[in-house]
């Protein structure tokens, strides 16, 4: 997902631009809660929604939740639900008692359910949700309705278990004005007229997805099918104002689908719809139905361009980022909010890999340099771990730790393990957790299996610890003559906190001779004695940019 500042954290453009702009929402909606799937889990949501003609509210809605019980003697089911008016609740076809509390709908079962029991809960309701489903005019000044759920706002318009670990399949039946086009997760099953003024659209997503990715989008726009041959049906849903430019603006999409399909695994969903809609984010990775901000295609004057696609680099980045999420974030979803980097860090890095392939190595280096600067600046404000279990406002997790630093962690792992082991490990990880959830330790296990390396210390320092190394080099020449001699290199880490134990590549240039060594720190000070040729030596730390680090002023003794 890409966000813009007003809530979702930092605007990030240029080659590493990750965020787009948000509108402030109330802190309560962003409050952290790690709901445990302990007594029951949702299996499927069947959501039927009838919108009024002006697309300003829900006239009627019916959500049926298929439930599986996981514990003995369960007498109540607690659904996350906002402030919409509840008309009735039933369990397996029988009226049921329910109670409202802030953000909850508690349903009392007629008899205690036991582990393994399966039943359905139906909630009938109506009204205008205060969040989650955005009613707004689009770029053509026409009414629209768009789901926009991250992190935990889908319950404002769909009663559900609103946590990323509670994945389920979903179907949508949307009754909308006949003038409008509707898109939702999954495959379009039917589209039928209901009288002269209404059309009923039915979609079904057969793969379990996180609740924040369950979406509908309704507006009086255009549907355009991509002209390229793609691994899955690819289409664009845009206001008429964007109709001419959309094929060019979305031109990276077909290549991104092919690249990620080859690099990770086959595309996981039945289609891919790219939608220009009313979202608070620069892009929101809803499974098979990505929504992009209405300003995605706006000109911003003299900005960096993609060499391959001839569009702004920020547009290329956000399109690739959101498509990468279809694998990482949507198919493999973070188990807890502390594991968010498994979604955002992955999407950030894979967007960078896409840039590396299609715009070249220098563009990729630029991307990583910009990402590193964002990390350093962020740490001056908040020096917290990537795996953050403390921050209570979920919007504050949309930060450089989970995006750029997460991407850098993956890059360092790639360079440490080598491409073959790194990508094999990611494929092992993806295969094991596709259509499910994963933790940081699941990723470590997969990479260790692929590489044969023990990555405990790396993950402990980079994921569960904070900060980054700041290196300083001092050198002392010994017995140096025309025929050469020895150079003693002392590598110090000057950052606060514990040492980083990553191997550090060093390049030494002495006269016409270049030599590379690797220093393997065991603490904050490491020393290496190196034979060198004649001439005054110069030293470069990490010449290929494989480490997230800063350099303190070097000195000679």
Where are the predicted features?
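N-terminal, polar/Ser/Thr-rich
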Residues: 28-60, 139-144, 155, 164, ...
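Glycine/proline-rich low-complexity spacer/linker segments in large multi-domain proteins
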Residues: 34, 38-39, 115, 124-171, ...
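Surface-exposed beta-strand/loop patches in extracellular or lumenal glycoproteins
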Residues: 60-83, 162, 168-177, 441, ...
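Hydrophobic helix-coil surface modules that form long, contiguous segments used
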Residues: 61, 149-152, 160-320, 349
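A surface-exposed beta-strand-loop module
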Residues: 81-141, 195-197, 202, 523-535
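Beta-strand-rich binding/interaction modules
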Residues: 85-92, 455-456, 469-542
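Amphipathic alpha-helical substructures
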Residues: 266-268, 399-489
């Amino acid at each position: 997902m890409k966000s813009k500042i007003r809530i979702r954290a930092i605007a990030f453009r240029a080659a590493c631009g990750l965020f787009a702009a948000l509108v402030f929402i109330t802190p309560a909606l962003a409050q952290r809660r790690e709901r445990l799937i302990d007594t029951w889990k949702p299996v499927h949501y069947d959501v039927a929604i009838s919108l009024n003609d002006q697309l300003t509210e829900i006239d009627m809605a019916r959500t049926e939740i298929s439930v599986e019980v996981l514990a003995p003697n369960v007498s109540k089911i607690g659904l996350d639900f906002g402030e919409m008016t509840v008309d009735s609740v039933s369990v397996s076809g029988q009226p049921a008692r329910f109670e409202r509390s802030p953000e909850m709908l508690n349903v009392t079962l007629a008899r205690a359910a036991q582990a393994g029991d399966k039943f359905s809960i139906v909630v009938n309701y109506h009204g205008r949700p205060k969040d989650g489903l955005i009613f707004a005019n689009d770029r053509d000044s026409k009414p629209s309705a768009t789901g926009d759920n991250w992190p935990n706002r889908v319950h404002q318009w769909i009663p559900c278990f609103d946590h990323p670990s509670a994945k389920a399949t979903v179907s949508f039946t949307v009754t909308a004005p006949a003038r409008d086009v509707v898109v939702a997760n999954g495959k379009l099953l039917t589209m039928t007229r209901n009288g002269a003024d209404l059309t009923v659209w039915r979609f079904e997503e057969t793969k379990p997805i996180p609740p924040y990715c369950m979406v509908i989008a309704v507006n009086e726009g255009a549907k355009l099918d991509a002209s390229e041959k793609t691994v899955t049906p690819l289409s664009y849903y845009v206001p008429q104002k964007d109709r001419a430019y959309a094929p060019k603006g979305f031109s990276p999409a077909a290549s991104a689908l092919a690249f990620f399909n080859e690099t990770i695994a086959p595309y996981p969903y039945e289609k891919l719809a790219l939608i220009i809609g009313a979202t608070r984010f620069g892009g929101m990775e809803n499974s098979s139905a990505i929504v992009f901000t209405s300003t995605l295609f706006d000109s911003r004057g003299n900005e960096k361009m993609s060499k391959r696609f001839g569009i702004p680099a920020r547009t290329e980045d956000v399109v690739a980022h959101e498509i990468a999420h279809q694998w990482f974030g949507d198919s493999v979803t973070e188990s807890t909010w502390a594991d968010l980097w498994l979604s955002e860090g992955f999407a950030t890095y894979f967007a960078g890999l896409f840039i590396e392939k299609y715009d070249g190595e220098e563009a990729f280096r630029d991307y990583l340099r910009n990402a590193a600067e964002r990390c350093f600046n962020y740490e001056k404000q908040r020096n917290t771990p990537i795996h953050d279990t403390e921050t209570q406002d979920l919007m504050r997790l949309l930060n450089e730790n989970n995006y750029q630093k997460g991407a850098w962690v993956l890059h360092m792992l790639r360079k440490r393990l080598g491409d073959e082991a790194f990508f094999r490990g990611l494929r092992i990880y993806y295969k094991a957790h596709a259509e499910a959830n994963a933790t940081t330790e699941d990723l470590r296990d997969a990479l260790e299996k692929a590489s044969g390396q023990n990555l405990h210390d790396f993950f402990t320092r980079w994921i569960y610890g904070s900060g980054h190394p700041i290196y300083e080099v001092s050198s002392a020449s010994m017995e140096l003559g025309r025929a050469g001699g020895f150079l003693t290199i002392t590598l110090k880490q000057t950052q606060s906190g514990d040492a980083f134990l990553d191997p550090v590549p060093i390049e030494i240039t002495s006269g016409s001779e270049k030599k590379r060594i690797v220093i393997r720190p065991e603490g904050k000070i490491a020393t290496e004695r190196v034979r060198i040729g004649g001439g005054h030596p110069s030293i470069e730390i990490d010449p290929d940019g494989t480490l997230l680090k800063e350099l303190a002023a070097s000195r000679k003794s």
